[in-house]
Amino acid sequence: MFPQIFGKYVLERELASGGMARVYLATLRGAVGFEKRLVVKQIRPELSVDEAFVKRFVEEAKIAVELSHPNIVPVYELGVELGIYYIAMELCEGLTLTEILTDTGPLDPAEGAQVGIEICRALDYAHRRRNIVHRDVTPRNVLLDEEGAVRLIDFGIAAPVTSALSTERVEVFGSPGHMPPEQIRGERLTPATDVFAVGALLIEAWTGRPPFRRNSFEASADALNEPLPSLAEEDEELEPIAGIIAQAVALKAAERPQEAEALARKLREFSRQFDSGDVAKRRPHLRVRGFEP
């Protein structure tokens, strides 16, 4: 089945598959032996004939192509080949936060703080410079590359920050258990929407357990009203940051930090008590696994 020719790309193997898209390791081949490895994400053929879906995919891909930040995996191209729409993006060898938590368990306080700080850097750029919210900040969309950098991936469902005067309903996209109430209800999206997702992600990173994710959309929404896990009971070193994280996942958007940078400042203050060093350097074995078979 592989390799497959797909326009100017050679698809080497499938990396992931979901309800909307398939993701492939690919090679771009040019003159005199030039080769570049990257990732190609194709929307499923049955969705390529859905005009509304294609329009949204193209609009979102145009947003992603414009993003340029050290903590965001860049998208190189939006295209269509044989009637199939796709985006090509940088190949970052490393592990997702989901893989790290599965393989080695929860992060320690310093590691989690560093991950949170770098995610917030990416989001602050998206919010301030591009006026968009990510809408899907989850452990599977956070990548730790082999150089130790934290990279935010998949701005595929990013959306413009919603005006405070807007009464238009926003389409509900995102991952159950990582969306705040206003996102679930299709209401106004602001930077505080992503701040909630970062707070939920950090709780999971430090405890190994997602605070709100359950087996269904409805159960995940109901879990928002359940008591939060106690970070201080998980690790007493987390006590100084526990209150800030509780604010980040407040059900009312107005009660959260209103900017990603505001949360990052608190995380930087918290992290000053620890030795410096990124997660990959603190856990060298994480650097040996990437997209290679």
Go through each PLM region and give its residues.
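C-terminal lobe helix-coil module of Hanks-type protein kinase domains
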Residues: 177-278
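Conserved short submotifs of the Hanks-type protein kinase catalytic core
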Residues: 82-96, 100
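Activation-segment/catalytic-loop signature of the eukaryotic protein kinase fold
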Residues: 78
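AlphaC helix of the eukaryotic protein kinase fold
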Residues: 42-66
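Conserved N-lobe ATP-binding subsite of Hanks-type protein kinase domains
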Residues: 22
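Activation segment signature within eukaryotic-like protein kinase domains
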Residues: 115-116
